[in-house]
Design a protein with these regions (language model features):
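Functionally critical loop-and-helix segments that line ligand-binding/catalytic clefts
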Residues: 67, 71-128
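A short linear-motif detector with a strong N-terminal bias
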Residues: 1-2, 34, 55-58, 72-74
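Structural recognition of the beta-strand scaffold that forms the well-ordered cores
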Residues: 18-24, 52-56, 75-78, 93-96
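Extracytoplasmic/secreted cell-surface and envelope-processing proteins
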Residues: 1, 28-34, 62-67, 86-88, ...
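Substrate-binding cleft of extracellular glycoside hydrolase catalytic domains
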Residues: 1-51
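Aromatic-lined carbohydrate-recognition surfaces of secreted/lumenal glycan-active proteins
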Residues: 49-63
């Protein structure tokens, strides 16, 4: 709950912004505690911003820890590197396919992502 409160107090979203994104990874808690705490955060953020948050996680983490159907309605940003296509068969919106990409004008390596949809679908995901 404190993390959700901190997020709400720190992040002001404007028209055209993507919904809040939560990077969820394994921590010391057991899977049931993790899922419970995650759902509390998601519900609080969704009530405040009136939009479903995006879950950013790895393909393996999603299949191991977020396999409960209560998480199926959330848009996913799946990190799955060094493969030709994302293996996750569920409803994913973004795929981060590398963390060592290159782009003109940027000296350091960068993350590269693909949106699973059209430009119009991407616009529909944004804050209105």
């Amino acid at each position: 709950v404190r993390q959700a409160d901190f997020f709400i107090n720190s992040v002001k979203l404007d028209t055209g912004d993507l919904p809040p994104v939560l990077d969820i990874e394994k921590r010391g808690d057991d899977a049931r505690t993790l899922r419970r705490d995650l759902k509390i955060w998601l519900d609080k953020i969704e009530r405040h911003y009136k939009v479903k948050p995006i879950l950013y996680t790895s393909y393996k983490f999603k299949t191991r820890y977020l396999n409960d159907s209560i998480f199926d309605s959330y848009p996913y940003w799946i990190a799955h590197y060094y493969v030709d296509s994302v293996e996750y068969k569920g409803n994913w919106k973004f795929w981060q396919h590398t963390d060592v990409g290159t782009l003109p004008g940027i000296r350091e390596k960068v993350d590269l992502n693909i949106f699973n949809g059209s430009l119009e679908e991407l616009k529909c995901m944004t804050i209105r």
